[in-house]
């Protein structure tokens, strides 16, 4: 490559709002690279970056410890494999304040909003401990299905990834590398915007936690079949990365030739504290049951 890693990424500002690197300049540099276009790659490799956004960096609204170092390793991996990666897809968690997992959707008996990380159960609704300010019938229906069908509990998150804010944006240095690749390889970045339904969480990129219409992103699932390798990294390992992988492997559970093409970069993702044990159990199942490859970014050869 003509461009150096440090021309594209400044590791000292990962997770910060300002970007000292001029995007126009690095895209001009990308255009001067001599790579073959993505469509001519004999081996089709997809890099799927899950929610690598400002609000999930350490200083973000829902910061994940270790996220900034994850971004450094992710950008180094993409740089080292620039010509081998055919395409990049990124998920972008996108919300408004008035969603079922944000505080202002709920009040207690005294009219107070729940603190972030409060768990709200069906029993809490029945006892009057918490009640929905907005759409109480659908809110109860969501919690009921979440507990019965998904075996989960609604967690109230800090306001995060609010549409149009800096927290909603891709992390700056990651974005530098992603769009450098896009121009250098003549490959359009696929953006998977998720999380806009006010009545459901959407951790995974394929479907909502609960949806009365039963929508799943078949278009993206069908695209996955065309790749020889699917590389996955991002934040948080315990939630959006885990659920994205789970949704993909469950859809392809009878097709191991697809699931064994998945490579998860274990040094390029971190968990929200408190969820580590259950997360490791889930990833072990991905490996044993679905033949998903769990590797370090420095170990995989493209």
Label the predicted regions.
Residues 1-48, 52-90, 95-302:
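Active-site-adjacent betaalpha module
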């Amino acid at each position: 490559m003509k461009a150096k890693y440090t021309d594209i990424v400044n590791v000292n500002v990962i997770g910060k709002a300002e970007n000292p690197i001029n995007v126009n300049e690095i895209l001009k540099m990308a255009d001067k690279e001599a790579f073959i276009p993505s469509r001519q790659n004999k081996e089709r490799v997809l890099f799927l970056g899950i929610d690598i956004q400002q609000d999930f960096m350490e200083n973000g609204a829902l910061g994940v410890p270790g996220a900034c170092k994850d971004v450094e390793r992710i950008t180094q991996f993409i740089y080292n494999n620039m010509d081998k990666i055919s395409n990049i897809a990124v998920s972008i968690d996108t919300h408004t304040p008035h969603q079922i997992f944000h505080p202002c959707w709920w009040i207690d008996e005294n009219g107070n909003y729940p603190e972030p990380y409060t768990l709200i159960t069906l029993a809490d609704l029945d006892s009057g401990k918490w009640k929905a300010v907005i759409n109480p019938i659908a809110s109860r229906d969501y919690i009921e299905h979440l507990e019965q069908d998904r075996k989960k509990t609604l967690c109230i998150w800090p306001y995060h990834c609010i549409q149009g804010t800096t927290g909603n944006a891709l992390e700056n240095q990651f974005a530098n590398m992603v769009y450098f690749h896009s121009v250098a390889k003549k490959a359009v970045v696929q953006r998977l915007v998720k999380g806009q339904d006010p009545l459901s969480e959407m951790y995974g990129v394929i479907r909502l936690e609960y949806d009365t219409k039963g929508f799943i992103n078949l278009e993206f699932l069908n695209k996955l079949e065309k790749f020889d390798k699917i590389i996955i990294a991002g934040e948080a390992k315990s939630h959006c990365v885990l659920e994205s992988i789970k949704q993909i492997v469950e859809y392809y559970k009878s097709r191991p030739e697809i699931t064994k093409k998945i490579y998860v970069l274990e040094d390029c993702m971190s968990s929200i504290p408190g969820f580590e044990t259950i997360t490791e159990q889930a990833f072990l199942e991905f490996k044993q049951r679905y033949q998903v490859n769990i590797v370090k970014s420095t170990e995989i050869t493209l």
